[in-house]
Amino acid sequence: MSKKPVALIILDGFAMRDEAKGNAVAQANKPNFDRYWNQYPHALLKADGEAVGLPEGQMGNSEVGHLNIGAGRIVYQSLTRVNLSIREGEFFENETFLNAMNHVKEKGSSLHIYGLVSDGGIHSHINHLYALLELAKREQVERVYIHGFLDGRDVGPTSAESYLVDLEAKMKELGVGELATLHGRYYAMDRDKRWDRVEKSYRAMVYGEGPAYSSALDVIKDSYENSIHDEFVIPSVITNEDGSPVATIEDDDAIIFFNFRPDRAIQMSQVFTNKDFRGFDRGEKLPQNVYYVCLTHFSETVQGDVAFKPTNLDNTLGEVLAQQNYKQLRIAETEKYPHVTFFFSGGREEPFPGEERILIDSPKVATYDLKPEMSAYEVTDALLNEIEADKHDVIILNFANPDMVGHSGMLEPTIKAVEAVDECLGKVVDAILAKGGAAVITADHGNADEVVTLEGKPMTAHTTNKVPVIVTEEGLNLREDGILADLSPTVLDLLGGKQPAEMTGKTLIK
């Protein structure tokens, strides 16, 4: 097949759901979408959970959706990547972890593990801590100390006790590990250069300074009695019977920071890894020759080893089109412009050769329910001029409305948003067809399909419903088990282009 131009049209936040109540997609008058759906081959795609590299059951979002679509493969997010490595056993063979453990065995020193002790799944997951304890046991590391950062933000504000009880039970079961300090994340995980907070955590871990308690649960009990919840627990030291700290970080020790999200892990990591650190005076007991491990790549400014190194996304659709000398256009309004450029290109800022970009300003309104059409008409007018000029072989287009207005949790404006997009969709697709081209009409995740719950409450979050895909080419059959990663291979199939090995998605065309 060799169709040109091929337009990949992403209706942001537009998924399919049988229940019409609270469903702006179902209730909207959308003659163009319905016409294409009835006339052309169509299917539903999974756009959530493990199909897009997230934990099972987790709703997709625009960043993840565009990453997967543009990459033509499942792009595993950090949480899922680590979970999978534990499940498949690679975690326990990770060279960086083993280096840290060998370091302390050779030096006769201690392994310190710190991070956010919860299952919030935003910055960390307690299961990753458990896996590290299991690994320490396997590797026969004798002295393992945990410095627990307490959450209270991505989980309940007073939930720390349940996590600490579970952790104590896990350490007892394995016969490995001891809690040495506890810190509210407000201190240990600051990201705004409030170094006085980070210093309190540092001094607890290195100097054994701070409120002292004989057990972790005493820290929690005392904090709650003083109306201090998990996030704000003052960095506290757990002591032995003789009043000495259970452990402090010393020369030749190793540290593993098990948070996977970088932003709140950078500052604490800089304290221990950077020779020219200027945030505060680390004092003469600054530990030397510490083997420091970051779970993921935190920042160029952190001089530690990385256990799960970044995966470079080579041969995304944009790069493949450039290599095969196809001209491409990326077009969206402000709200979704980064998605059709940076995220679609696998985290690359600069355009590929032969790639043109058009940014249309989003309207300046407080909230988009006040202007549900947003800038869809302006995007469409600009695109129709481009199609008429025959400049591009491939067009990547995003209509932001169903998602951005859907976030309002207001049904009527979201219906209007879907109707405006449908009007624009008709103009664009008909112009593409008139040029002898083909359109792939799809979405990145759900939202407008459930704006109000069955109980009548506003629903502002994304949904896990499947998204549509229509290929405007009669006589084709589409697979029913597709995912977002299959869209780029489908575009290449329509163009008659070659699919690279890195793209593990499969064309939807049977």
UniProtKB/Swiss-Prot annotation:
<feature type="binding site">
    <location>
        <position position="444"/>
    </location>
    <ligand>
        <name>Mn(2+) 2</name>
    </ligand>
</feature>
<dbReference type="GO" id="GO:0005829">
    <property type="term" value="C:cytosol"/>
</dbReference>
<dbReference type="GO" id="GO:0006096">
    <property type="term" value="P:glycolytic process"/>
</dbReference>
<dbReference type="GO" id="GO:0030435">
    <property type="term" value="P:sporulation resulting in formation of a cellular spore"/>
</dbReference>
<feature type="binding site">
    <location>
        <position position="445"/>
    </location>
    <ligand>
        <name>Mn(2+) 2</name>
    </ligand>
</feature>
<keyword id="KW-0479">Metal-binding</keyword>
<feature type="binding site">
    <location>
        <position position="336"/>
    </location>
    <ligand>
        <name>substrate</name>
    </ligand>
</feature>
<feature type="binding site">
    <location>
        <position position="12"/>
    </location>
    <ligand>
        <name>Mn(2+) 2</name>
    </ligand>
</feature>
<dbReference type="GO" id="GO:0006007">
    <property type="term" value="P:glucose catabolic process"/>
</dbReference>
<dbReference type="GO" id="GO:0004619">
    <property type="term" value="F:phosphoglycerate mutase activity"/>
</dbReference>
<dbReference type="InterPro" id="IPR011258">
    <property type="entry name" value="BPG-indep_PGM_N"/>
</dbReference>
<feature type="binding site">
    <location>
        <position position="185"/>
    </location>
    <ligand>
        <name>substrate</name>
    </ligand>
</feature>
<feature type="modified residue" description="Phosphotyrosine">
    <location>
        <position position="36"/>
    </location>
</feature>
<keyword id="KW-0464">Manganese</keyword>
<comment type="similarity">
    <text>Belongs to the BPG-independent phosphoglycerate mutase family.</text>
</comment>
<feature type="binding site">
    <location>
        <position position="191"/>
    </location>
    <ligand>
        <name>substrate</name>
    </ligand>
</feature>
<dbReference type="Pfam" id="PF06415">
    <property type="entry name" value="iPGM_N"/>
</dbReference>
<dbReference type="GO" id="GO:0030145">
    <property type="term" value="F:manganese ion binding"/>
</dbReference>
<dbReference type="Pfam" id="PF01676">
    <property type="entry name" value="Metalloenzyme"/>
</dbReference>
<dbReference type="InterPro" id="IPR036646">
    <property type="entry name" value="PGAM_B_sf"/>
</dbReference>
<feature type="binding site">
    <location>
        <position position="462"/>
    </location>
    <ligand>
        <name>Mn(2+) 1</name>
    </ligand>
</feature>
<feature type="binding site">
    <location>
        <begin position="153"/>
        <end position="154"/>
    </location>
    <ligand>
        <name>substrate</name>
    </ligand>
</feature>
<feature type="binding site">
    <location>
        <position position="403"/>
    </location>
    <ligand>
        <name>Mn(2+) 1</name>
    </ligand>
</feature>
<keyword id="KW-0324">Glycolysis</keyword>
<feature type="binding site">
    <location>
        <position position="407"/>
    </location>
    <ligand>
        <name>Mn(2+) 1</name>
    </ligand>
</feature>
<dbReference type="InterPro" id="IPR017850">
    <property type="entry name" value="Alkaline_phosphatase_core_sf"/>
</dbReference>
<comment type="subunit">
    <text>Monomer.</text>
</comment>
<dbReference type="InterPro" id="IPR006124">
    <property type="entry name" value="Metalloenzyme"/>
</dbReference>
<comment type="pathway">
    <text>Carbohydrate degradation; glycolysis; pyruvate from D-glyceraldehyde 3-phosphate: step 3/5.</text>
</comment>
<feature type="binding site">
    <location>
        <begin position="261"/>
        <end position="264"/>
    </location>
    <ligand>
        <name>substrate</name>
    </ligand>
</feature>
<keyword id="KW-0413">Isomerase</keyword>
<dbReference type="InterPro" id="IPR005995">
    <property type="entry name" value="Pgm_bpd_ind"/>
</dbReference>
<protein>
    <recommendedName>
        <fullName>2,3-bisphosphoglycerate-independent phosphoglycerate mutase</fullName>
        <ecNumber>5.4.2.12</ecNumber>
    </recommendedName>
</protein>
<comment type="function">
    <text>Essential for rapid growth and for sporulation. Catalyzes the interconversion of 2-phosphoglycerate and 3-phosphoglycerate.</text>
</comment>
<keyword id="KW-0597">Phosphoprotein</keyword>
<feature type="binding site">
    <location>
        <position position="123"/>
    </location>
    <ligand>
        <name>substrate</name>
    </ligand>
</feature>
<keyword id="KW-0749">Sporulation</keyword>
<feature type="binding site">
    <location>
        <position position="62"/>
    </location>
    <ligand>
        <name>Mn(2+) 2</name>
    </ligand>
</feature>
<feature type="active site" description="Phosphoserine intermediate">
    <location>
        <position position="62"/>
    </location>
</feature>
